């Protein structure tokens, strides 16, 4: 088993979970800042947004998770703040981040669709990296299986939990997001085939489809009325994205890169 603590500095400990999130964040900021000028924004617009949105998104992701696990946290109030042990819901972070984005764009007089198109591949890459935090924490895994011989030994060893090998759903989602990121980056190099909103719509459909399937493999899902909450959210986002695509492609003069 890999130690979930990356290193200690006196009384302070830095967990691998946090390292994965921070690495994903830094790469996301770099990619978004690099793309911003092509969408009539500046790198400062991106950085200022991240400084506001990132801490709020973490809080939102935690509140979302705690709300659906309140039966436990109501009896363990001190654990609410122990996010280094895991327990932040991606959809909670995405919802919070999107709300902050629209408010930020309103006050900065920026186009929120442009911003979402810039953010989509960056978020997808950050999610691909961040999922490895679940690996180090031994969480977000699936059912017990007899063997995982198709995986490297370090993953097999870390996925041996409570006396059984577990389906590495974190890995499936990480790879799915990485493939989606590559598709977006290749597609974005052919802007004539794009209109504003296509990239964020693709993100919602791609991530939603992957999460819909992979969530069904997990054993620790947040539940609502007997159905996994993330599957509700996935279906909702897929529908929103499809409707948005049809609406945008019926309009004129909304090319991806404005001259």
From Swiss-Prot:
Ordered alphabetically, the record's keywords are: Cell membrane, Membrane, Transferase, Transmembrane, Transmembrane helix
What GO cellular component entries does it have?
plasma membrane
Stated role: Catalyzes the transfer of the diacylglyceryl group from phosphatidylglycerol to the sulfhydryl group of the N-terminal cysteine of a prolipoprotein, the first step in the formation of mature lipoproteins.
Q: Which organism is it from?
A: Streptococcus equi subsp. equi (strain 4047)
Q: Name one Pfam family in it.
A: LGT
Q: According to its UniProt record, in which pathway does this protein act?
A: Protein modification; lipoprotein biosynthesis (diacylglyceryl transfer)
- Name used for this protein in its record: Phosphatidylglycerol--prolipoprotein diacylglyceryl transferase
- Binding locations of a 1,2-diacyl-sn-glycero-3-phospho-(1'-sn-glycerol): 131
Question: What is the top EC class of this enzyme, as a single word?
Answer: transferase
| Chain segments annotated as transmembrane | 12-32, 46-66, 83-103, 109-129, 167-187, 194-214, 226-246
Task: Please report which protein family the annotation says this sequence is part of.
Answer: Belongs to the Lgt family.
Named from the GO MF annotations, one term is: phosphatidylglycerol-prolipoprotein diacylglyceryl transferase activity
């Amino acid at each position: 088993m890999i130690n979930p603590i990356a290193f200690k500095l006196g009384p302070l400990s830095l967990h691998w979970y946090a390292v994965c999130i921070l690495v994903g964040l830094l790469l996301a900021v770099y990619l978004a800042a690099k793309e911003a000028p092509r969408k009539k924004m500046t790198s400062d617009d991106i950085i200022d947004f991240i400084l506001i949105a990132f801490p709020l998104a973490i809080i939102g992701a935690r509140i979302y998770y705690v709300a659906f696990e309140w039966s436990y946290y109501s009896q363990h109030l001190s654990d609410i703040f122990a996010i280094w042990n895991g327990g932040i819901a991606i959809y909670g972070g995405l919802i919070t981040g999107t709300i902050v984005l629209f408010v930020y764009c309103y006050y900065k007089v920026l186009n929120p669709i442009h911003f979402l198109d810039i953010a989509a591949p960056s978020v997808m890459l950050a999610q691909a990296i961040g999922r490895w935090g679940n690996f180090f924490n031994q969480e977000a895994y699936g059912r017990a299986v007899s063997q995982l011989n198709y995986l490297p030994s370090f993953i097999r060893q870390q996925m041996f939990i409570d006396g059984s090998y577990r389906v590495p759903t974190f890995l499936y989602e990480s790879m799915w997001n990485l493939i989606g990121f590559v598709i977006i980056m290749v597609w974005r190099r052919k802007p004539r085939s794009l209109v504003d909103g296509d990239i964020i719509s693709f993100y919602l459909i791609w991530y939603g489809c992957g999460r819909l399937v992979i969530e069904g493999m997990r054993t620790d899902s947040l539940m609502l009325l007997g159905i996994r909450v993330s599957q509700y959210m996935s279906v909702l986002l897929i529908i929103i994205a499809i409707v948005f695509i049809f609406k945008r492609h019926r309009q004129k003069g909304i090319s991806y890169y404005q001259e």
